[in-house]
Each structure stands twice: as C-alpha cells, then as structure tokens.
C-alpha cells in the first residue's frame, strides 16, 4: 500500500480515485495533482514508481492543507466563531443549522432525534 499524507491508499485503485482517500483532496484536486505532475489518470496506484509517489507527497505537502492540519484548522475556526459570540458562533454552540435553514419542521440531522415532550399524559376520552 502506498502511504501518502499519513493515509494508506489501496493498491488496485486508479491514481485520481486513490488520492481522494486523503481528507481534503476531492475529485478536482486529485485531477489537478495528476495533470500538474503528468501522471496518467488511468494508471493504478500499484503501477506508480517510488519516484512518482515521492513527487505526489512533495506536491501535496507544498500546496495543500490535508488530514490533521485541515481538521485542526476547521475546529479552530468554529472555536473562534464561538468565542466571538457572533450569530454563527451561537448557532454552532446551540447545535443548530448555521446557514439560515429553517428549523421549525426540519433540521433533524443537526438537532438529533426527535424527543417526546415529557410530563404530558393523555387524558381518556369522556363518553
């Protein structure tokens, strides 16, 4: 297995698909890496030479923020918003949608599973 940016990439994957296993590199950036380093997209990871893998590692380290650095930067950005006590920070703190989505009848993913209201008992119907 090729190890790039601390991630084991499966041997049988195509190069541009295998690079997307790295957090922070999607289809667009993997294609950009392949074209700039002149590595064919149809090539598989196990067909790459050690020199090619080294070139990919150096290119990613020089041009992208990936894996732990990107995750840390993302969490620090959210922490900064919360510390500023701005609207976006307060929405993050309350675990509600941040970008203006409605919450009255949706936002189940962000708010979590629906919770029944405790303490209310149904009264039996009178005849």
Curated annotation (Swiss-Prot):
| Higher taxonomy | Bacteria, Pseudomonadati, Pseudomonadota, Alphaproteobacteria, Candidatus Pelagibacterales
- Gene3D superfamilies annotated for this entry? 1.10.8.50, 30s ribosomal protein s13, domain 2
Matches recorded under Pfam families: Ribosomal_S13 (PF00416)
Protein name, entry field: Small ribosomal subunit protein uS13
The alphabetical list of record keywords is:
Ribonucleoprotein, Ribosomal protein, RNA-binding, rRNA-binding, tRNA-binding
Q: Which gene encodes it?
A: rpsM
Instruction: Note the superkingdom of the native organism.
Output: Bacteria
| Assembly behavior | Part of the 30S ribosomal subunit. Forms a loose heterodimer with protein S19. Forms two bridges to the 50S subunit in the 70S ribosome.
Key word Repressor present: no
Q: What's a BP term from Gene Ontology annotated to this protein?
A: translation
What terms describe the molecular function in GO for this protein?
rRNA binding; structural constituent of ribosome; tRNA binding
| Function, in words | Located at the top of the head of the 30S subunit, it contacts several helices of the 16S rRNA. In the 70S ribosome it contacts the 23S rRNA (bridge B1a) and protein L5 of the 50S subunit (bridge B1b), connecting the 2 subunits; these bridges are implicated in subunit movement. Contacts the tRNAs in the A and P-sites.
- Ribonucleoprotein keyword on record: yes
Annotated source species? Pelagibacter ubique (strain HTCC1062)
Q: Which family does it belong to?
A: Belongs to the universal ribosomal protein uS13 family.
**GO CC terms, sorted:** cytosol; small ribosomal subunit
